[in-house]
Design a protein with these regions (language model features):
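Amphipathic, hydrophobic secondary-structure cores in small proteins
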Residues: 49-51, 78
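Conserved short histidine dyad/triad with adjacent acidic residue
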Residues: 34-48
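A short, N-terminal "cap"/entry segment at the start of jelly-roll beta-barrel domains
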Residues: 1-30, 110
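Histidine-centered metal-chelating micro-motifs
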Residues: 43-44, 63, 79, 83-88
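Short acidic-glycine-tyrosine-enriched beta hairpin
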Residues: 68-83
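A cytosolic small-molecule/anion-sensing beta-strand core signal
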Residues: 58-59, 74-75, 93
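Glycine- and acidic-residue-biased ligand/ion/polar-headgroup-sensing regions
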Residues: 51-62, 67
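Ligand-binding loop in jelly-roll beta-barrel domains
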Residues: 83-107
Length: 110
């Protein structure tokens, strides 16, 4: 197999202690997939980074804010946040996001 495989059962869930948890899935230098779980009311504080990010809602409901504009996202919805834009999310209903980053997030590997 020339591809990079990550079995969900082998990916460690890191509990942040704030109602969120991250599970780094398959990745290489150019791309990273991360499963992020949220309890209702938990949030990803507004921040910025040099990575382009795509968030896909697997379950739950989220209010996502990019550069001061908010949108509600439900299962099956997705959003792309270009590099350098301020963004954050609030979980309205317990759920899980699949976040894809390019390039990979070195800070998620520590």
């Amino acid at each position: 197999m020339k591809g990079i495989v990550c079995h969900h059962r082998d990916a460690l869930l890191k509990d942040a202690g704030d109602g969120t948890g991250k599970r780094v899935l398959a990745w290489n230098d150019q791309l990273m997939a991360v499963e992020v779980s949220f309890e209702e009311g938990a949030f990803g504080a507004e921040h910025t980074h040099p990575h382009t990010q795509c968030s896909y809602v697997l379950s739950g409901r989220f209010s996502y804010c990019v550069e001061g504009e908010s949108v509600e996202l439900a299962p099956g919805d997705s959003i792309v946040v270009p590099s350098g834009l301020t963004h954050g999310t609030v979980c309205l209903e317990k759920g899980v996001l699949l976040d894809i980053f390019t390039p990979h997030r070195q800070d998620f590997l520590g």
